[in-house]
Amino acid sequence: MIEASKLKAGMTFESEGKLIRVLEASHHKPGKGNTIMRMKLRDVRTGSTFDTTYRPDEKFEQAIIETVPAQYLYKMDDTAYFMNTDTYDQYEIPVANVEQELLYILENSDVKIQFYGSEVIGVTVPTTVELTVAETQPSIKGATVTGSGKPATLETGLVVNVPDFIEAGQKLIINTAEGTYVSRA
């Protein structure tokens, strides 16, 4: 059992027969009354997200999640296809369940597939990935003074804020946990 106050982003637990993944968690202390935990959660099986609050002392059954090495093969319609690199088994995962992760991976990328018992529930991507800039505004001379950066669309469709000197066609290292630019590759 795990208390609501110990839940952090990325953890998975069971509640009312549902398998729930924490997307965001924060303590909130209102002016009057007790502390509450505000959370943004995702139902792992349906892919739906919702916001809720819990008392910090509420307890939940922590889900045991196993991972296996896999390779992203391709996406067709509403399904993403992955292959276990040890056994060569193929898995079909609804795109709604891995929509965010697909922004960080290209075909043939290495990932880890998450299992709850024998059920495939999601994908874990590496902490950093190398992606190519598909489109961005051209650099403007003297624009380095502000240092605010500019948006860039990467080859997967992900949009990140990058420094002004980045141009289309360059390879970048992206932090997948925060969705931010790290450096040029």
Curated annotation (Swiss-Prot):
The keyword Transcription does not apply. It is found in: Cytoplasm. The keyword Protein biosynthesis applies. GO terms for molecular function: translation elongation factor activity. SMART domains: EFP, Elong-fact-P_C. Pfam families: EFP, EFP_N, Elong-fact-P_C. GO terms for cellular component: cytoplasm. Keywords: Cytoplasm, Elongation factor, Protein biosynthesis. Pathway: Protein biosynthesis; polypeptide chain elongation. InterPro entries: Elong-fact-P_C (IPR015365), NA-bd_OB-fold (IPR012340), Rib_uL2_dom2 (IPR014722), Transl_elong_fac_P/YeiP (IPR020599), Transl_elong_KOW-like (IPR013185), Transl_elong_P/YeiP_cen (IPR001059), Transl_elong_P/YeiP_CS (IPR013852), Transl_elongation_fac_P (IPR011768). Gene3D superfamilies: 2.30.30.30, Nucleic acid-binding proteins. GO terms for biological process: peptide biosynthetic process. Belongs to the elongation factor P family. PANTHER family: ELONGATION FACTOR P, ELONGATION FACTOR P (EF-P) FAMILY PROTEIN. Involved in peptide bond synthesis. Stimulates efficient translation and peptide-bond synthesis on native or reconstituted 70S ribosomes in vitro. Probably functions indirectly by altering the affinity of the ribosome for aminoacyl-tRNA, thus increasing their reactivity as acceptors for peptidyl transferase. This is Elongation factor P. It comes from Streptococcus pyogenes serotype M28 (strain MGAS6180). The gene is efp.
